[in-house]
């Protein structure tokens, strides 16, 4: 359980995520996990929500796709989604990812879908709906805020509401 939020504005994209890892639904195991990270020669940023082991498995599969498709984010995401739908091991994974590079911002869902958001905002995890609503409002009504500021504040707002999200927020931008 976590909150990951991405915002694209004026050619800049930012991805923010909190650091809380919860065991079951009662115990906070860690508060400073890094769920947003740069991969593929620092050219791609991913953020993941769901089971930790499942998220790492997805990251590994996605990195292999990026290597195979020479860093083409969209093609790699679609190939991962196709495998996700077909592979019995991947079908059991309980995780989602937001992936981005300088050109694309995509949600890769647990059902094997690749979604390019309409609103230039996408959020996942237990606090995802709170963060997405907050980010859309800031994007529309706070013109002086940067994408990084909006993404971070959206995760912090979710952290005020969602017990599975904390305020130890990491942000990466392109």
UniProtKB/Swiss-Prot annotation:
A molecular function (GO) term: threonine-type endopeptidase activity
Summary of activators and inhibitors of this protein: Allosterically activated by HslU binding.
Active site, renumbered: 2
GO cellular component: a single term: HslUV protease complex
Family matches, as SUPFAM superfamilies: N-terminal nucleophile aminohydrolases (Ntn hydrolases)
Gene Ontology annotations of biological process type: proteolysis involved in protein catabolic process
Residues that, per the record, bind Na(+): 159, 162, 165
Key words, A-Z: Allosteric enzyme, Cytoplasm, Hydrolase, Metal-binding, Protease, Sodium, Threonine protease
Chemical reaction(s) catalysed: ATP-dependent cleavage of peptide bonds with broad specificity
Pfam families reported for this sequence: Proteasome
Keyword hit for Cytoplasm: yes
Coiled coil: none
Signal sequence segment: none
UniProt-listed Enzyme Commission number(s): 3.4.25.2
Highest taxon listed in the record's lineage: Bacteria
Cross-referenced InterPro entries: ATP-dep_Prtase_HsIV_su, Ntn_hydrolases_N, Proteasome_sua/b, Proteasome_suB-type
CDD domains xrefs: protease_HslV
Protein location: Cytoplasm
General function of this protein: Protease subunit of a proteasome-like degradation complex believed to be a general protein degrading machinery.
Subunit-structure text: A double ring-shaped homohexamer of HslV is capped on each side by a ring-shaped HslU homohexamer. The assembly of the HslU/HslV complex is dependent on binding of ATP.
Family: Belongs to the peptidase T1B family. HslV subfamily.
Protein name (Swiss-Prot/TrEMBL): ATP-dependent protease subunit HslV
């Amino acid at each position: 359980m976590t909150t990951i939020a991405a915002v694209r504005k004026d050619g800049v994209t930012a991805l923010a995520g909190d650091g809380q890892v919860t065991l079951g639904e009662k115990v906070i195991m860690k508060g400073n996990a890094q769920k947003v990270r740069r991969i593929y020669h620092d050219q791609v940023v991913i953020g993941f929500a769901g089971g930790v082991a499942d998220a790492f498995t997805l990251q590994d599969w996605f990195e292999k796709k990026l290597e195979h498709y020479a860093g083409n984010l969209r093609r790699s995401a679609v190939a991962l989604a196709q495998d996700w739908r077909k592979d019995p091991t991947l079908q059991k994974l309980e995780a989602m990812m937001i992936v981005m590079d300088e050109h694309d911002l995509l949600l890769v869902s647990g059902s094997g879908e690749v979604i390019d958001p309409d609103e230039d905002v996408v959020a996942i995890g237990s606090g995802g709906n709170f963060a997405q609503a907050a980010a859309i409002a800031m994007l529309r009504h706070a013109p002086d805020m940067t994408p990084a500021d909006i993404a971070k504040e959206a995760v912090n707002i979710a952290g005020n509401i969602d017990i599975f999200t904390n305020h130890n927020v990491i942000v990466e931008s392109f």
